[in-house]
Amino acid sequence: MSDRDSQNDLGAKVFVLVTGANSGLGFSICCRLVDEFLKSHRHPRESLTVIFTTRSTRKGNDTLLRLQDHLRRASASASAPAAASARVTFVAENVDLSNLVSVRALSRRLNKTFPKLDAIVLNAGLGGWTGINWPKAIWGVMTDLVHEVSWPSFKIAPAGMVTDAQTALGDDKEPRLGAVFCANVFGHYMLAHNAMPLLRHSDMLHGPGRIIWVSSLEATVKHLDIDDIQGLRTLAPYESSKALTDILALTADLPSTAPWVKSFYSVDEQPEPRKETELEPPHPNMFLTHPGICGTGILPLSWPLFYSMLAAFWLARLLGSPWHTISTYAGACAPVWLALSAQAVLDDAEAPYRRNGGGRVKWGSSCNRLGQDQPVCTEVDGWGYGGVVGPAILEGDRRRRRKRGAVDLTAEEKLQYEDLGRKCWQRMEELRIQWDELLDEAEAQAKSEA
């Protein structure tokens, strides 16, 4: 087989990594990847490999069985069920995103095992909430239902939650690491950087590799303090981490962030020197998404309260909320669209915003009253609709219900957001380099003591 034939075969194979897949949104993303792939990629040579992560082997095995069962059902409607089923492969991996040693170990296994990654869906997360302010929740739902079940103000979280020690170097050498920050942002950030060789090898026919950050509708820049980027002093560490996620993804292609983004996209180790005539592969594209408001277990509730929450979500949808997807399968709409669509489709979707001076878009899963889902642009505090100054430019965005108190983006606010993006990228790269050095030192120490 010639090199070109080999490359064509690899180009027909799609590899997608999904973190946090044992339940909820992550599991539904895996299921929907299968469904959408079998619908849109019908050639018998085209295949999909879904690499999913859980926190334990037991959870991984259980998730694998449930995904295989879903694949059998999805393939049953195909003209050749066995052939359709054979084109999809699941691979279970373990990782604890609050443990940087675990993240590094996963990265090494991925780089040794797979030829490329076409997309990584950074979904796993930690809420960090310890309870609910019930009087405030009941009053808010009774008097302002749609707003309170979209942007709730009644969740309780403590400040100062930190991870367990990452290394054996001791407290004098190892700085504190925020638990929610690490699980939601920094663990993924380290994983994406370490997987850069695979993302850069992506030769999928519809564009470069994709880093897809799963954020939240609740993210707002007011929750982020650049001097407390890990959210150790805030009582809203989850919202702070998701605001940071938004900022990193939306400002990744700006000139002001370029020095640090280039460092993030760099490959630490080149297994073979590149030939003089060989072009450097393009860096991945970074995308931002959220699942709308769906029923997951990220906020621990008893079953009666969980179903009461779903009932409130249904009522909010009937009252005109565009974001209450309710089911995690509908919530997976936008992440899967970003993972599998041709690059031209994504470019066309962003084009109206870029033509009007904007940039990256936060793509959210949206539902109408009948439950029909679609990916749509989400308004972001400080970034507006796709970074366009002024009112929404698309009719769909103008008609969509806004957050109460939302105002049109001003040029000054956009500049402030871009400057915040520059500072966040700088801090994140400094943290990554610091922790890579600490992990290297810990590994060297462990080897010397062995």
Curated annotation (Swiss-Prot):
Active site: 215, 238, 242
Membrane topology label: Peripheral membrane protein
Alphabetical UniProt keywords: Endoplasmic reticulum, Lipid biosynthesis, Lipid droplet, Lipid metabolism, Membrane, NADP, Oxidoreductase, Steroid biosynthesis
GO function term, MF aspect, one: 3-beta-hydroxysteroid 3-dehydrogenase (NADP+) activity
GO cellular component, one term: lipid droplet
Function: Sterol-C4-methyl oxidase; part of the third module of ergosterol biosynthesis pathway that includes the late steps of the pathway. The third module or late pathway involves the ergosterol synthesis itself through consecutive reactions that mainly occur in the endoplasmic reticulum (ER) membrane.
Protein name per UniProt: 3-keto-steroid reductase erg27
